[in-house]
Amino acid sequence: MYACFAPAIDYDGGKYGIGLLSKKAPVHLQTIALPGREEARALILAEFEDYIYCCTHLSLTEEDRMKSLEILKTFAASYKKPLFLAGDMNAEPESDFIKELQKEFRILSNPRQHTFPAPAPKETIDYVAAFKQNDKGFAVVSSEVVNEPVASDHRPIVVELRTAEKADKIFRTKPYLQNPVGNGMTVMWETTVPAYCWVEYGTDTTQLKRARTIVDGQVVCNNKLHKIRLDDLQPGQKYYYRVCSQEMLLYQAYKKVFGNTARSAFSEFTLPVTGTDSFSAVVFNDLHQHTHTFRALCRQIQDIDYDFVVFNGDCVDDPASHDQATAFISELTEGVRGDCIPTFFMRGNHEIRNAYSIGLRDHFDYVGDKTYGSFNWGDTRIVMLDCGEDKTDDHWVYYDLNDFTQLRNEQVGFLKKELAAKEFKKAKKRILLHHIPLYGNDGKNLCTELWTKLLEKAPFDICLNAHTHKY
């Protein structure tokens, strides 16, 4: 803590005045003399990087308080930052002084809560206020008079404020594309602060539509992880888009306060033409969050014009926290130009482990909202399966918190429907993807007995697996 003091009078061999404690050191400090006929008064003005904070103890005399207010207004008007005023004004809410104060200042504390005398408060003479000229960059989260009757002859006031983040600090990640099926595309990204978000998109950058996520009639907002679906897109058409995030400083039943708005640069994408007979895709697996390996692989494909990317498991392995997951997902999506190229994230056995494993799905928009599924890319049908863990559910290391037997059985039903579907039958080519191969493992594959009879007769052209760390 940093201590600042503005002496007003000599007292008992020392000084008496205004004190200020702050977590950060002020960039500028000033003591301003104020009138007081019974005793001299003072104002301490501390300038910080983003705001000004002033403390004072005004005179008992109305005339002196009015003169002090004029001095305060003059100093406040010289700053462009938010300016806050706190202290003992020696005036009740109905007084002429407070009425004059409120013409230029917005009171942030609750005048209905008495502050004096501390043992049994009957009057409100202490306030926290903000200069109206520059009071747009924050919101009052809470205000209270603390139940402390002993520390001082006045009760302390606590006002919690939330200040607006700068626009260039609002985005935490770049946008990344997900779930490019059904003539649609999902755009995802994260912000550093709770925000109200939308996507602006169109076939050029001058005629833009707006998309938001609306659930049961309400816009999804005041969150940090954002997922917005763009529907009714035309295959083969190039689209431009940018993501927009406006900070939400306050979200209450009858009041919302917004901060600054950040807008990303424009990115572009194109959905595949129905029936196209060729495409390029990149499949990664078992990266195990090895950044150097991933970047080296990206250098090998930097000159390839690929259409989509699949991360076939054990890439965002053992996710311990939201921060850890976000960091490596950003590494992956930015490495493959995920703002322009859609990515599919499939689970391996390691995505299922650790404290944030369940939360990991919030970062993706799975096809059909399942960790398994199927889709068409041109004339090709692509089927993705989720093998779950590589050990039985009753293994001690899972602590009875897994039931992948149910998930594997569920996919038996999915496979039966998929193999009989016209989309699968009419496809010219068929690709199967799953993390753990059905054969060639050191141990027993828990999917083999369930899936083999269905898959061995299915006309897949290629099956791509991972897990074994062997080529």
Which residues does each PLM region occupy?
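Acidic, histidine-bearing metal-coordination/catalytic regions of metal-dependent phosphoesterases
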Residues: Y2-A3, V27, N134, D153-R155, ...
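Active-site environment of divalent metal-dependent phosphoester hydrolases
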Residues: Y11-G13, A40, T61-D64, M89-D96, ...
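Structured beta-strand-rich core segments of catalytic domains in phosphoester-bond hydrolases
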Residues: M1-Y51, S142-V146, V220, N376
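Metal-dependent phosphoester-hydrolase catalytic domains
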Residues: T31-I32, D64, T74-F84, N90-K169
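Extended active-site neighborhood of metal-dependent phosphoesterases/phosphodiesterases
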Residues: K15-L20, V27-Q30, C244-E268, D323-A420, ...
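Active-site beta-strand/loop signature of hydrolases that rely on acidic residues for catalysis
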Residues: M1, L21, Y53-T56, I71-I98, ...
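His/acidic metal-ligating clusters that form di-metal
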Residues: L45-C54, R65-E100, A195-C197, L208, ...
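Conserved beta strand-loop-helix elements of the APE1-like EEP
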Residues: D12-H28, P121-F138, L161-A164, D231-L233, ...
